[in-house]
Structures are given as C-alpha cells and as structure tokens.
Amino acid sequence: MNWLRRTMEKIKNPEENKELKRWKGKYEDAKTKYDEILKDMEINEAYYEGSKSIYGPNKTSVAPKQAGNVRNIIYELIESQVDTSVPMPKVTAIHAEDEELATKIEKFLENEVRTLGFKQINDLQERIVPVQGGDFFLIEWDNTKGTHCTIGDLSISTIHPRNVIPQPGVVDVDKMDYIFTRTAQTKEYVKLRFGKDVSMEDETDPEIRDGSVSEDLVTVITAYYKNKDGGIGLYRWCNDVTLEDMEDYQSRQIEVCEKCGRTRMGREEQCECGSKKWKKETDATEKIMMAKMTVAFNPLTGEEEVQQTQEERDVEYYKPTGYPIILRKNISKDRYLLGTSDVNAIRDQQETVKKLGSKINEKLLKGGSYAVLPEGLGIELTDDELKIIRVKDPAQRALIDVITVQADCTQDRMVLEENYQWAKSTLGITDSFQGKYDSSALSGTAKQYSINQAAGRLESKRIMKNAAYSKLYEMMFKFALAYADQPMPVISQNTDGSMNYAHFDRKEFLKIDDAGEPYWDDEFIFETDPTSTLMVNREAMWNQADMKLQSGAFGVLGDLKTAYLYWLEQERNDYPHAGEIKRVIEERLAEQQQQEQAAQMQAEQMQAMGGMPNAMPGM
C-alpha cells in the first residue's frame, strides 16, 4: 500500500517529484563527500565519553583488546575550559541620530538572552565546540510564541555539527549555494506542523540520534539555498514526501484559499467558499501611516511654509539576508568548515594514557605472593583466619618462605604523567587554570600571572565565541525587524537602580531618505560587551566595590552619601538586600537634609532677631 501511494503521488505531481529528486540527489552527494568527517565526529564523541576502544594511528582500525582502565584526560581538559558566561550584546550606531535606537536594540537583545534559554544553549555548546571543532545556531521566527499582546517571538536552538551537511568544497557558510540540516521529528509533529501524513514513512538517518530505529520518528531534511534574487529559499522533505517548498523563505508568507484567494484566518480548516485547500503566497508590502512634508504658500504671511501631514503608504516588508544558520568555531582551521578539535589535538596522548593505564592495572593485578614449601608438605587451603601447617622438624620449618612478586610500574607512571602534561601543554591549560595546587606559582600575583598566561593561550577560542554571538545578535535584530508586528516589551535598569519599561517597535526603524522614499534602517554595528564576563561573576563585582569603598572612590568613609553610592552600585550588581539597605539610607539622608534645613532656618531667624534695632529705651 505504501509503495502504491507513493507511485500515485509521483504520477499526480510530476513537477514536485522532479524537484524532490533534484534535492535528494544533491543531499546524497553532499553527505557522501562529508562522510569521513561524520565518522570522525563519532570517534571524537567516543573519546569524550571515555571509550575503552584502542584506535590505530589512522583512527580507522580498532584493536581487538579494550583498555582495562581509562583515565579520560580529554573529558578532564575539556571540562576545565568550560565558560558558563554568555557574551552580552553591544550595539553601536553608525549615525549620530540612531544612538537612542542602538540602546533600545541592545536592551531588547539582553531581554531575549534572558528569556530564550541562552544559558542552556551555551552550556551544551561549551562541550560540543571543543569536541567537534564547532557547532551551529539556528534562528527562526515562531508565530506560536509571544505574550498576551504580541504574536510570535524569536526561537534560538543549537544544531549538532553531524546534523549539518554543507555544500561540497565550500568552507564558508555565507558563500554556499545551499546547505542541509537534518532533524528527527515525530510523525505526529510533522502532520501537525506541515499538514502531511508521514505515518507510513521510515526513519532514514537514525544515526543523527543514538542509531536505534524508532517507528514513531522520521528524518526531516531541510535545504536552505540562495535563490535567483539573492534571497534565501527553503526546500524540506521527509523520505518521498515534500513538506515545504518556498522560493523566498524569509519573505512574508500568507496562506490563501486555492479556489477564491481569501486569506486564511488562524488555523481554520475550511474556507467560506467550501474549499479545504490552502496555498502560500508572498506578502510583499504593508500599509503604514507616515509623515509627509509639503511646502505650501501662506497667504497671511506671504511666505512659503513647510507643513507636515500624515499619509498611508505602501512599504515593503523588511527581509533578512543570509542563512539562518550561524557557525561557532573552536579554533579557525584553513580549508575546513569546522575549526580544530581539541580531541584531535591530544588524541595521541589519550591513546598512550589508555594503554599505559591498562598496563599498570594489569601489572598490579597480576602481581602477588607465592608460598615456598618443602616437597611433600601440604597446607590447609581454606578461608579460616588461623591455618595449621604440620612440619616434621625445625629444619623443615626453615624451608617455608613467602616470595612477593610485584612488577615495577615507576617508568610506566612517569611516561603516563608526561603524556598528561603534554596534552595540557598542547591546549594551554595549567594547574592554576584548573584550580589545582601550582608549585611554580609562589605568590598570589605569580599564580594570577600563570592563569593569565593560560588564558592568553585560550584567547582564540573566546574570540571565535564572541564573533559567533555578535553575528547571532545581528540576525536576531533583523528577524525582529522583519516579523515583530507588535511592539515587544523591553525591561531594563536605569542608572539609579529603578526599572525602565519600554517597547521595541520595528516601525521606529522606518526612515525616509532624501528622495522621499521609505527604507528600513538596519545600519548598526553588533559586537559583544567585553565586560559582560566580569559582570556575570557577581562575587568579583562585590569585592571590587568593597575595594573601591575602602580606597575612597565613593567618598569619605562614614558619610551617608558615600554609603548611598556604595549600596547603589551593589544593587546594580544584585547584592542580596542591597535595595532595602539603600532605601534605609535614603530615608536617613532625607531626615538629615530636613534637620540641616531646620537648623539653617533657625540660624537665619536668630540672625534676623539679633540685627533688629532695640525699640526699648535704655535703663
């Protein structure tokens, strides 16, 4: 039945079948040419998880005997590098008049970081990136999300590098003509989202999960490609079923009735005309009330005056450019899509450590004690605590001895430790960086210097992380500019510690050029804030504030104004109960000011009374 249904679909939709065949061919070709790297990813993951398999020099052959004892130095050194901080956005305006908009973008992105699960995404990528050499962000606009007053919101997820198949021969995502992603989805989800029944389809790529085949899952493959106009198109399928085909994926899409052309309202199943078939069409423009400047003659003044009126104009929707897939590299590597993997860098040392660890373990376990007895003398071989040996005379007793046989593991331990140190040196990790005792650093300053040296070795990884987040923030802004029809609430903190409630409204970015034509202003520089890592470490910020207080940076110690500035800073750093303490100090300051004013008024009155002429005659 399944074969018959597929055959009928091919007969009914020859053009759709032709397009499906074309994309499936491109996908299979790209996957075949990427196969070696996909296999390498599986081995890298096995190393990180502490596989006991012993690989040959070419990484393909596996020894028949497994390691008996694995010291997983790859796991240890990768976990030592984990940075839980998320780089926060920094937006700079190119034009002076856009500085306020740049601040609003920055606050909007900070809100999105807090609400979209960036901490969980970063925590996952901190392991995937060094293991595989890179990882991918996927940015989408989800109309099912939002608040009571808004429809839709950004959706940010991570795609494992094994689930991204690039165009063969191209190592820059932005320069690719097409790129594939593959995901495992339930059949029910596919039917609900795309309206296609895939209940009879099989899972084609179970290796993107754990390799086990599930009857409830299917593999959904998505091709993002550059269309003829330079935009981004999308073709998505599952086995022999086309799920989506959009020539201009990032343009506004509306669903209309195939029969009468009426716009579909929500998720209605049947049109008013009776048709149940819907199709997607591009919605290119929207009507927006805009200011219009005109020059008119004023008969009262006899001069021409500029008048501003409102008129409704058709404005093209803003459309993002570029793939919604953003690569975060570990360390740049020439002629490769992904960066250098830490696993590949120290694989030889891990193999040696596995072999030596197993050898030491075997030596220790096979060593033991042997009893030397005269010929013919028997002993009790029981588990009793006290055993009896019967000898004929003292001479026979003198022949009884115990020989302890224990292999020397000193050299093995020395070589194992050398390989461990080589691995650490390769990645630029010191004992101080790991939080271990470092005998080479004799003072706190020396230890901090040692940590800074290690941090310098890892600076490239931080630069690549910041670059990926900068690009992600730029794409997030562009998606909001394109699809956020309702103003999105933005919460931020003012300099005095109070909360500021505003909105991100995309229409604020609609400008008119010198020719009178409307355009969307997206000319901003997106970076990451270099101080965000320190700001995440609240305890360090608290300690810094304490040091500044003692040094007199806030003012004279003991003065209420000094205390107010100090606790204002601690409140910004989220110090517990800092806000309550600050309010108490504010009350004391107010009381102090009232007392000073009262004392000043009293002094003025006394001065006024003392300066009046004496009306009484002298006695």
Task: Give, region by region, the residue ranges found by the protein language model.
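Generic signal for short, ordered secondary-structure residues
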Residues: 84-91, 116, 325, 332, ...
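Core catalytic machinery and nucleic-acid-binding channels of phosphodiester-processing enzymes
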Residues: 345
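C-terminal anchoring/interaction modules
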Residues: 1-40, 45-58, 129, 137, ...
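Short, flexible segments with low predicted structural confidence
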Residues: 80, 100-101, 324, 394-396, ...
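Extended, helix-rich architectural segments
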Residues: 1-301, 310, 415-418, 510, ...
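Protruding loop/beta-arch "assembly-hinge" segments enriched in small, turn-prone residues
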Residues: 329-334, 340, 353
